[in-house]
Regions:
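Composition-driven recognition of glycine/serine/threonine/acidic- and proline-rich low-complexity segments
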Residues: 1-225
C-alpha cells in the first residue's frame, strides 16, 4: 500500500492509502482522520496476555485499531501525541523499538513485547521494549527529529534518545565513566551498541522534557486556593 509522510519533521503524520485487501494496524487514539469508505475495528492483538504485556512493558495501548477499505479504496491519517517526526521502515529484519515509539504497521508485521531485564528497568529504555518482526511497512514516531546511525564497531547513545535499532546489534546499558561523573554531569545512563547494524535516535529526550516541565506544575496546595 502507498503512504505519505506529512508535516515532518516537526509535527509528523502518515497518510496511508488503502485498497481492497489492505490492512493497517495502529495505536489506539492515533487516528487523525479517514475517508468514509474506511472501516475501523478495535481488538486485542495477540490475545489478552500479549496485549497486557505490550501495554505494561512496552508503553503501548492495550487495544490496536485495524483500518481497512473493504468496498474499494480510502485514506487514513495517523499521528502521535508528541511533536516529532515519523519514521517509515520497510521491515526486512527484526527491530527493537523503545517504549512508546510504535505508531502503526501492516498487519503482516508482528509487534510483541520484549523484556529488557534489569538493564531496561533501570534505564531510559523503560521497563520493556517492543520487538517488530515479519515483513511490511512499519511506522515509528519520535520526540523531535530522527537520525539514522550506521554502527560498525561500537556506538554510544543516551538511553532517552534511542528510538529503535536492529535486533542483530548487541547492547549494554552503563554509566558514563562511573556513577560520580554521571551524577555530576547531568547525563543519564547510556547504551553501548556493538556489532554492525542501524540505530535510530531522536533529538529530544522525553524524561528530560518531563523534568523540565515539573517546576511549572501546579502544586497540591493550589487546589485549596
Amino acid at each position: 500500500m502507498d503512504y505519505e509522510l506529512i508535516g515532518t519533521p516537526d509535527y509528523g503524520m502518515v497518510r496511508v492509502h488503502l485498497t481492497h485487501g489492505d490492512e493497517v494496524q495502529a495505536e489506539s487514539g492515533a487516528m487523525v482522520g479517514m475517508d468514509q469508505s474506511v472501516e475501523m475495528e478495535t481488538s486485542m492483538k495477540g490475545g489478552f496476555m500479549e496485549s497486557a504485556k505490550r501495554s505494561v512493558m512496552g508503553g503501548e495501548s492495550f487495544f490496536l485499531n485495524t483500518f481497512t477499505a473493504p468496498n474499494g479504496s480510502g485514506r487514513v491519517e495517523l499521528a502521535a501525541g508528541l511533536p516529532g517526526d515519523v519514521l517509515h521502515l520497510d521491515l526486512g529484519g527484526p527491530h527493537v523499538i523503545t517504549r512508546g515509539a510504535f505508531l502503526a504497521s501492516d498487519t503482516s508485521v508482528n509487534v510483541d513485547s520484549q523484556f529488557g531485564g534489569s538493564q531496561g528497568f533501570f534505564s531510559g529504555l523503560g521497563f520493556g521494549m517492543l520487538r517488530a518482526s515479519g515483513s511490511g511497512d512499519l511506522y515509528l514516531t519520535s520526540f523531535g527529529g530522527i537520525r539514522e546511525v550506521e554502527v560498525n564497531g561500537e556506538y554510544v547513545v543516551d538511553t532517552g534518545h534511542i528510538l529503535a535499532f536492529e535486533d542483530r546489534l548487541d547492547f549494554n546499558v552503563e554509566t558514563v565513566g562511573g556513577w560520580k561523573p554521571t551524577l555530576l554531569s547531568g547525563e543519564g545512563l547510556v547504551c553501548r551498541f556493538r556489532g554492525e547494524g542501524t540505530v535510530y535516535t531522536q533529538t529530544r529526550n522525553t524524561p528530560s522534557f518531563a523534568s523540565w516541565l515539573h517546576p511549572f506544575r501546579r502544586g497540591e496546595t493550589d487546589d485549596d486556593e
